[in-house]
Amino acid sequence: MENESSESRNRARLAIMELANMISVPMSLNAAVRLGIADAIWNGGANSPLSAAEILPRLHLPSHTTIGGDPENLQRILRMLTSYGVFSEHLVGSIERKYSLTDVGKTLVTDSGGLSYAAYVLQHHQEALMRAWPLVHTAVVEPETEPYVKANGEAAYAQYGKSEEMNGLMQKAMSGVSVPFMKAILDGYDGFKSVDILVDVGGSAGDCLRMILQQFPNVREGINFDLPEVVAKAPNIPGVTHVGGDMFQSVPSADAIFMKWVLTTWTDEECKQIMKNCYNALPVGGKLIACEPVLPKETDESHRTRALLEGDIFVMTIYRTKGKHRTEEEFIELGLSAGFPTFRPFYIDYFYTILEFQK
């Protein structure tokens, strides 16, 4: 029998209690976003520490709220998220607690363009998505059907297409994540310097091409390639041509092809087909520049590894049971199978990696 008073058993029991109660973390984060806590603290003035009672009047409370909210319960949420590095706690005297934003908390502050990571948090915790999580085990038992489909009767992207609210939140969430990521890679990656014509496969409204062309004026023409119904709604962008089509059939020709967050939701065989079509569209020496999450070879307890593996389970649960985050070795194999002899990774962002495949 184990000695239950030993240090190792005490730590084990504590760890499993934390894991069992882990749902408190995303749900409290979701609550913080719904209430607008980050904006309330930031707009209070230079991120000055505020107490729960001082934050409360600044929150997004429903108009029918009669008591003005509960500062004690707000403080409970603030304390819990402080333990995860979202807020900093400042003790005033022996009783009062005040809170400011950490760098993590600042990602939830709405910027001048109306964007932040807040929409990403909300998008991940919509009611339809939450219904899928109790069914994660079915991805092992019945991998042919996604837990999301089992819970909602149809695929996530099908529902996004039918619901303006879900689609709008999805687009805002992706923009909130994409813009800072694109700024980071455009500052740290020079692979677009020699490109004359660039295709963005799955480029949606063309926002990434807009940013690339602004940073690299040598790119004479950008081709935003996506489904016909998607590019039909895309705005006019100087230097960008919107082209509708199917990446599983063919891809427009160019010096280089850019692809962001596309491969992770497709199976290995589907990825091979997409990448083969990209290979066929490139000249010798041309590049496929893909931006995807890359799993580490070995599993550890770092924030990066956990974030990537959590994202992998999200893909499995919500989008495709056999879509997945991949290791560098798996991407090399996909590239070789599509004909690309040369592969180079660029680890500029901690979550998304630039993967350069050269023909």
Swiss-Prot record:
Catalyzed chemical reaction(s): nicotinate + S-adenosyl-L-methionine = N-methylnicotinate + S-adenosyl-L-homocysteine
Residues that coordinate or bind S-adenosyl-L-methionine: D226
Known outcome of mutating H124N: Loss of catalytic activity
GO molecular function, one term: O-methyltransferase activity
Residues of the signal peptide: none
GO cellular component, one term: cytosol
Entry comment describing in which tissues the protein is expressed: Highly expressed in anthers, pistils, developing siliques, and developing seeds.
Primary location class: cytoplasm
Keyword Iron-sulfur belongs to the record: no
Record has S-adenosyl-L-methionine as a keyword: yes
Catalytic EC class: transferase
InterPro entries referenced in this protein's UniProt entry, alphabetically: COMT-like (IPR016461), O_MeTrfase_dom (IPR001077), Plant_O-MeTrfase_dimerisation (IPR012967), SAM-dependent_MTases_sf (IPR029063), WH-like_DNA-bd_sf (IPR036388), WH_DNA-bd_sf (IPR036390)
Result when mutating N21S: Reduces catalytic activity 4-fold
GO BP: methylation; nicotinate metabolic process
Location relative to the cell: Cytoplasm, Cytosol
Keywords: Cytoplasm, Methyltransferase, S-adenosyl-L-methionine, Transferase
Effect caused by changing Y120L: Reduces catalytic activity 2-fold
EC number: 2.1.1.7
Protein family according to the UniProt entry: Belongs to the class I-like SAM-binding methyltransferase superfamily. Cation-independent O-methyltransferase family.
Biological role stated in the UniProt entry: Involved in nicotinate detoxification in planta. Catalyzes the conversion of nicotinate to N-methylnicotinate, which is a detoxified form of endogenous nicotinate in planta.
Record-given protein name: Nicotinate N-methyltransferase 1
Originating gene: NANMT1
